[in-house]
Amino acid sequence: KTVKTTLGIHTCDDIDGFDVDHPDFLAQGMSADTTEYVSIHAALNGTIFFILSETGELHKYNLSKSFDFRTATYENEFALNSEINSFSFSKDGTRLFALNAEHNTMELTTFSLSSPFNTSITPTQIHIVDLSTIGIDLVDGENSSATDVEFNDDGSEMFISVFNQEGDVLERIHQFSLGKNYDVSTASHIGSVGM
């Protein structure tokens, strides 16, 4: 199969990677203004993947071949808050979690999706949890930012990585136990480890 681009005609063998800034993908709906991507998530055995831009746009792609980004087609964009720098989904795809990256703001927003991994219908915000009230300490004079959120397979455990620009330990991963799977409002802090 050949691909016609502004740079000429190429065979699929010439495509070594997946470039979301490539004109062929921009033509599918990706904004040309987006310059940096901060998080990625694959779902449904690699047939769907999401990319989060630095400005908080969550872009969804469908893949006709699992984990082969060369087979991707653009589906839609869901605009999150511009401070969001990380996201995750529940295993069944009915919950979306968005982590605020603003300095000294440790908020995790939970959204409900109308159907698994469906961001074409605006997700409904369920709640926002201030992680500094349930175990992540903010130290005066230090610029801490939450950088990633992940869950174990069944959603009974949550992990938040935090970057601290001025402390002795620059990275710390916090572990939380969830009283109800994938319900961040039931989180209790277990501990943390410095990296």
Where are these regions (language model features)?
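Surface-exposed loop and turn segments in beta-propeller and other repeat-based domains
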Residues: 7-32, 73-80, 124-141, 188-195
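Beta-rich catalytic cores
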Residues: 36, 83, 145
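Residue-level detector of Asp-centered blade-edge/turn motifs that repeat once per structural unit
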Residues: 44-45, 91-92, 153-154
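Beta-strand-rich domains and repeat architectures in extracellular enzymes and scaffolds
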Residues: 32-42
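Short loop/turn segments immediately following beta-strands, especially the blade-tip
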Residues: 4-16, 62-70, 110-121, 176-186
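Short glycine/acidic-enriched loop and turn motifs that connect beta-strands
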Residues: 55-57, 102-106, 164-169
